[in-house]
Every structure is written in structure tokens, then in C-alpha cells.
Swiss-Prot record:
The lineage of its organism: Eukaryota, Fungi, Dikarya, Ascomycota, Pezizomycotina. InterPro entries: Aldolase_II/adducin_N, Aldolase_II/adducin_N_sf, MethylthioRu-1-P_deHdtase_MtnB, Salvage_MtnB_euk. Its cofactor is Zn(2+). GO terms for molecular function: methylthioribulose 1-phosphate dehydratase activity; zinc ion binding. It is found in: Cytoplasm. Keywords: Amino-acid biosynthesis, Cytoplasm, Lyase, Metal-binding, Methionine biosynthesis, Zinc. This is Methylthioribulose-1-phosphate dehydratase. Binds 1 zinc ion per subunit. Its EC number is 4.2.1.109.
Amino acid sequence: MSSDISNNDHLVLSDNPDHPANLIPSLCAKFWTLGWVTGTGGGCSIRENDLVYIAPSGVQKELMKAADIYVLSLAAQTASLRDRVYLRSPPCYKPSQCTPLFLAAFTKRRAGCCIHTHSQWAVLVTLILEAGGGPGGAEDAREFRINNIEQIKGFGKGFEKSGNLGYHDTLRIPVIENTAHEEDLTEFLEEAMDKYPDTYAVLVRRHGVYVWGDNVHKAKTQCESLDYLFQLAVEMKKMSLPWITDITPVKTRRS
């Protein structure tokens, strides 16, 4: 990792609460209350045109400040995972190992925001799938599927597609295996994105989830919707209720 000779603090100084350097700490403080970024885990990154703003590694997310944020140019990055060029680096922290995974969402999906959580519900869902508790049993350990739940409407139909999923649609989220070092997940996350071109998220077994969106609003609401569905799925499993059901659409007078 290398950084520019000037610290470029002007990139993170703004009175605008919606500036990425202010928004990331604000979002992470909210995520901390939800248990998504406990113990310095998890993170968030926002892309504004070519500039990418990233929460650092090892910081208590509920205490993070704008001055803690890294900034890089997306166009200036190389294929190497370990040779990042930063426009602005805080003096007291290390770059997040999530960085190449965030960049994958920005380059492959043109996302405006990517959120990484260590949600317990996300982890539990991957464990249920690992134990053969998914709709397809042990053969289905690498995909979370659920349908006929209202909150599914919170997700877009897919990359470069207009509109959202419907109540009767099936939401599919790929699952990849965890690695000892976070940055080593990158190739597997990219493979999952290629295999599931319409997904807005990738689960990491025994670890958490990466969720992205066209902008901060969409990434945040999709992350919230997904966590709701993960919790619901765990509770449904306790009651032996299936995640995939065959429900006949209700006919209305205007149908």
C-alpha cells in the first residue's frame, strides 16, 4: 500500500451531512446499534464518481469520524490486491481488507455504495444451509432462496434492469466459503457476481454478507430488507416452516 505525499484532508472535510466522509461514520453508527459492525468488524464504502471513500480497518465503527476515512481513485487502481494507491490516508489506521471486495461492486456493478455486515442472522442462515437445512437440502448449501414474503419487494430485479422483485418472486443470494484473510474472498465474490448477475448481495459462510446498491439509499434499504429476511428465515426454520412455498396468486376484481 502506498499513499500520496500530501494527506489531502480537503477530500474528507465538509459541513454537508450527506458528504461520503460524513455519511459513512453516520451509517456505521446506526449499523453498530443493529449488531452489524460489532467489535470493529464490517464496514462501508461509498463511490462518488471516481472517488471511493472507505472506512478503515480496526476502528470502532460507532466512534468513527470523517478524519478516519480513506479515499482512493477508482480509475487509478491496478489489478493487484495489495498495491493500492490512496489519495488520502488517515495517519492512525490501516486500510480495510474489505477494499478489493468493495471495489468489485463498484467496477462490476457500477454500485454507488457497498455495505459489509457481520450480522448474526446472515451467519446463522449460512450455517443452516451448511447443515442441509435449505430448500434443496445438502445440495443447496451455496444458495439462499426465499419467496412469497412481502419484504422481497425491497430488492431490484437486477443489474441494469428496471423495477423491483414482486411478492411471489424468488430472491436468490449466493453463498461463498470464508477465507482466513478477507481480501482473499475477492475472487470468489467476483465469481458469484458472474454466476448471479442479478444479485445485490453475496453471503460469506460463517462470516457475514456484502450488499451493494446503485446509491447509498438503495444499498441501505436492501441491506435492511435482507437482514429482515435472514432473521425471518431463521425463525421460520425453528418452526419447520419452508422458505420456498407454492402459493396461488390471489385473484382480485381488477385482475
